[in-house]
Amino acid sequence: ELPIFAFTHCRDVVVAVSRAGGIGVLGAAGFTPEQLGQELDWISARLGDKPFGIDVIMPKKFESGDVPDLQSMIPERHKAWVEEVLARHGVAPLPADAGAGAHHGISGEQIGWTHELCRRLLDVAFGYPGVKVMVNALGTPPADVLAECRERGILVGALAGKVKHALAHRQ
């Protein structure tokens, strides 16, 4: 009804915006697939047939890879700098058994940056008829995701940091 989109991690905001005629878009990267299903159940129960969206973080260039691969890509000097900043400000280190994604609030899971992890989130989201928009925070999604969205009648949006990115999205 209105050209208003609200990107949020808060299900209450998704519902409020969609009820008001806009499109509430839930940021999914911080959830496990199970948690996302619970959030989408809650949203769907309150919106009925009103549309809403899901926002993922899926790099087109990383169509495979697991958490250790991504962790190994972080330069040691960056890790040392983060540790120094945390120590300087008195932030306690995480317990050794906290899991790879604990700093994102995800027990034992990496934030959904890989194709595999993000696909699991999308598989959950695509099971909800109210999901009418899928937005990728890292540009054009991989071809298989675009194809599935088209097949399901789901609109696709993507971040465009430069004009060349916006032009690429048109294709």
Annotate each language-model stretch with its function.
Residues E1-Q171:
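Active-site entrance/lid segments in N-terminal catalytic domains of soluble metabolic enzymes
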